[in-house]
């Protein structure tokens, strides 16, 4: 195997792990996300000039899935049911003030609730 194919395999595995974390217990979405990942990787099987960019895209997608996607569930039987968010350990936490600051260093003085 060449080096790009080894890193492509690694990126694919990271993407599958990220889908497992982001879409835990939501099998319909999990299967759809994995199917899309497989389809994209199969569409770009041959090593080309843009292969490193595609591998980087897969790694960035895995990072977004792992750190920024939160799923919510609601009891469908109750009309006034509240949403429960499934926030796992790897979810990026912050507050609105840190978003407004941009690229500057942020000191968070209180825990997010």
Curated annotation (Swiss-Prot):
GO terms for biological process: mitochondrial respiratory chain complex III assembly. InterPro entries: Complex1_LYR_dom (IPR008011), Complex1_LYR_LYRM7 (IPR045298), MZM1/LYRM7 (IPR050435). Transmembrane segments: none annotated. It comes from the Eukaryota. Its main location: mitochondrion. It holds the Pfam family Complex1_LYR. Assembly factor required for Rieske Fe-S protein RIP1 incorporation into the cytochrome b-c1 (CIII) complex. Functions as a chaperone, binding to this subunit within the mitochondrial matrix and stabilizing it prior to its translocation and insertion into the late CIII dimeric intermediate within the mitochondrial inner membrane. Modulates the mitochondrial matrix zinc pool. This is Mitochondrial zinc maintenance protein 1, mitochondrial. The gene is MZM1.
């Amino acid at each position: 195997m060449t080096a790009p194919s080894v890193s492509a395999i690694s990126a694919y595995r990271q993407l599958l792990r990220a889908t497992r974390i982001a879409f835990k217990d939501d099998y319909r979405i999990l299967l759809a996300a994995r199917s899309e990942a497989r389809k994209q990787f199969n569409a770009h099987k041959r090593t080309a000039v843009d292969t490193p960019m595609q591998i980087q895209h897969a790694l960035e997608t895995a990072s977004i899935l792992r750190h920024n996607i939160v799923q919510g569930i609601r009891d469908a039987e109750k009309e006034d049911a509240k949403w429960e968010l499934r926030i796992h350990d790897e979810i990026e936490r912050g507050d609105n003030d840190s978003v407004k600051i941009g690229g500057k260093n942020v000191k968070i003085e209180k825990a997010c609730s």
